[in-house]
Curated annotation (Swiss-Prot):
Subunit text: Binds to the underphosphorylated form of RB. May interact with other transcription factors in order to regulate specific genes. Interacts with RUNX1.
Low complexity composition-biased segments: 310-335
Keyword annotations from UniProtKB, A to Z: Activator, DNA-binding, Nucleus, Phosphoprotein, Transcription, Transcription regulation
Organism whose genome encodes this protein: Bos taurus (Bovine)
First and last residue of the signal peptide: none
Highest taxon of source: Eukaryota
Cellular compartments annotated: Nucleus
DNA-binding region extent: 208-290
Region (Disordered): 159-199, 303-371
Homology family: Belongs to the ETS family.
One GO CC annotation: nucleus
Pfam hit, one: Elf-1_N
Protein name (database record): ETS-related transcription factor Elf-1
One Gene Ontology term of the molecular function aspect: RNA polymerase II cis-regulatory region sequence-specific DNA binding
Gene name as annotated: ELF1
Length: 614
């Protein structure tokens, strides 16, 4: 364009040039073809370019003479980016075509390869780094010659350069090494303490060899002298008492369950060449250590603790627990009685009795018996009492057979146990855990306790209350002879216990008995220090003989005669007079005191007393 000084000439020159340019724009051979690609969706476009495009309708351009059209694109980061499209054409159709071409160029991919790679990583993988990259600012302009120009400015935050990208070099993989084996147990049986632990010559770990294993067994109470023992300790000679068990333990230690003595013997013969072991000539399963360590633990054969059984189930045998004869409580029942069964007392640690135990006779149901132990009781031992009473029916002596189950009572168990058997006698085992010296046993007819019970069925039933009285309470002598009388024909006479060196003691706080009931005013308060047991007889006949137990007093209450007579008359129909006398003598409530810790000398004599003697 030539420079003209006058302004009019300059304007004319510019207008002529514009006309020439319009003619050139009409020729399609001047410009290359523009390819417009349709994007599948607006969501993909937004995520691909990192921009939120606000589509405006074509009505925004109201005047065809406008030279500039502006379109706003709002970014996600609230940054306004203005794309300016400049058109020099005054014709409306040409302006629209130019704007469409500019929009097509705007939608096309950017020419920068680095920008394409970053856009691809951010849009396809939808990583969290999209928020860190600011979308580029694109300016599209059409020059006077009709050639559109695209100018794109890229702004990348500094944090993106420092952030690790997916193209970062991967960390080197770790080499897979050998898995470490778990440490083996020190001993095959319940991991005993092994005092001898030697390393091999190379100093690699604490592997236990067979000769060290045998030394460990010789120092273990669970295996010595049960499986292996010393024969000559000073010379280091030992014997495999149970070669199969030793080989089995060695196989368990080596994790070889099929180990036997032949395989283990080959390893022992290997030690002959090494000078560690030697075979004793002429003796089977006898070996000798050449060098003996000085810090060995020797176990004597006479030590009772050496016979502890191994915890290995393959080597376990029948367990035998030590039983204290003074702490045994025996009970006898008659297996021949109809409807009866043998009673076995089974606490937590009880063991079944052996059949070779001696058999003891049984007293009939109307007799009260206490058997004295031949051994002196221990100072801390307390009473264990089983009371047998059957006032109405007498069991023939021919049917009385005894079976003696044993039990070992643990003082840590609860202080009272009640065992019921299928027939008609109460059983109470009371292992005391307090230093008590006196027990009060009181009988109360069931008819006075349960008013709605049938008198004919409840006349022979009684309720027994066993109360332990501490020795610290004051004592009062009431009666010297203890009498339990039975006048029914065919029944044995009563047993009278006359202690020689024992004074009959009874606490002054014993509740008074009136018509078979306990008066609430004078009844003592039962607490944890004064245990009490209430039981009724519905089982077979049993007799107990705790060591050092003496019955010191039996007292009858005369107030209950009339009431009991009326109850028994309904039951006994064949002999009304005889049944009434039996009820007066047998069903009257009485109080019995059992004391322990006194000299166990008592004379038993048969004596018939009249009711007036009480």
């Amino acid at each position: 364009m030539a420079a003209v000084v006058q302004q009019n000439d300059l304007v004319f020159e510019f207008a002529s040039n514009v006309m020439e340019d319009e003619q050139q724009l009409g020729d399609p051979a001047i410009f290359p073809a523009v390819i417009v690609e349709h994007v599948p969706g607006a969501d993909i476009l937004n995520s691909y370019a990192g921009l939120a495009c606000v589509e405006e309708p074509n009505d925004m351009i109201t005047e065809s003479s406008l030279d500039v059209a502006e379109e706003e694109i709002i970014d996600e980061d609230e940054d306004d980016i203005t794309l300016t499209v400049e058109a020099s054409c005054h014709n409306g159709d040409e302006t629209i075509e130019t704007i469409e071409a500019a929009e097509a160029l705007l939608n096309m991919d950017s020419p920068g390869p680095m920008l394409d790679e970053k856009r691809m990583n951010n849009s396809i993988f939808s990583s969290s780094e999209d928020d860190m990259v600011v979308a580029p600012v694109t300016h599209v302009s059409v020059t006077l010659d009709g050639i559109p120009e695209v100018m794109e400015t890229q702004h990348v935050q500094e944090t993106y350069a420092h952030s690790p990208g997916p193209s970062s070099p991967e960390q080197p993989k770790r080499k897979k090494g050998r898995k470490t084996k778990p440490p083996r147990p020190d001993s095959p049986t319940t991991t005993p303490n092994i005092s001898v632990k030697k390393k091999n010559k190379d100093g690699k770990g604490n592997t236990i060899y067979l000769w060290e294993f045998l030394l460990a067994l010789l120092q273990d109470k669970a295996t010595c002298p049960k499986y292996i023992k010393w024969t000559q300790r000073e010379k280091g000679i030992f014997k495999l008492v149970d070669s199969k068990a030793v080989s089995r333990l060695w196989g368990k230690h080596k994790n070889k369950p099929d180990m036997n003595y032949e395989t283990m013997g080959r390893a022992l013969r290997y030690y002959y060449q090494r000078g560690i072991l030697a075979k004793v000539e002429g003796q089977r399963l006898v070996y000798q250590f050449k060098d003996m360590p000085k810090d060995l633990i020797y176990i004597d054969d006479e030590d009772p603790s050496c016979s502890i059984e191994s915890s290995d189930p393959s080597l376990s045998s029948t367990a035998t627990s030590s039983r204290n004869p003074a702490s045994r409580s025996r009970a006898s029942s008659s297996p021949g009685i109809k409807g009866g069964a043998t009673t076995v007392l089974k606490p937590g640690n009880s063991k079944a009795a052996k059949p070779k135990d001696p058999m003891e006779p049984v007293q009939p149901s109307e007799a009260l018996r206490t058997v004295q132990s031949t051994q002196a009781p221990y100072p801390t031992q307390l009473f264990r009492t089983i009371h047998v009473v059957q006032p109405v029916q007498a069991v023939p002596e021919a049917e009385a057979a005894s079976s003696m189950p044993e039990e070992t009572l643990n003082p840590s168990v609860p202080s009272i146990r009640t065992i019921q058997t299928p027939a008609q006698v109460p059983v109470v085992v009371s292992p005391g855990n307090q230093h008590l010296h006196t027990v009060t046993l009181q009988t109360v007819p069931i008819t006075t306790v349960i008013a709605s019970a049938d008198p004919s069925s409840a006349a022979g039933s009684q309720k027994f209350i066993l109360q332990a009285i501490p020795s610290s309470q004051p004592m009062t002598v009431l009666k010297e002879n203890v009498v339990l009388q039975s006048q029914k024909p065919g029944s044995p006479p009563s047993i009278v216990l006359s202690p020689a060196h024992v004074q009959q003691v009874l606490t002054s706080s014993v509740p008074t008995v009136c018509n078979g009931t306990v008066s609430a005013a004078s009844a003592p308060s039962f607490s944890a220090t004064t245990p009490m047991v209430t039981f009724s007889h519905h089982s077979s006949q049993l007799v107990a003989h705790p060591p050092g137990t003496v019955i010191t007093s039996v007292i009858k209450a005369q107030e209950a005669k009339t009431h009991i007579q009326e109850e028994v008359k309904k039951e006994v129909e064949d002999n009304e007079k005889q049944g009434t006398e039996d009820a007066e003598q047998q069903l009257q409530p009485y109080v019995m005191v059992v004391s322990n810790g006194f000299p166990s000398q008592a004379a038993i004599k048969n004596e018939l007393l009249e009711p007036s003697s009480f």
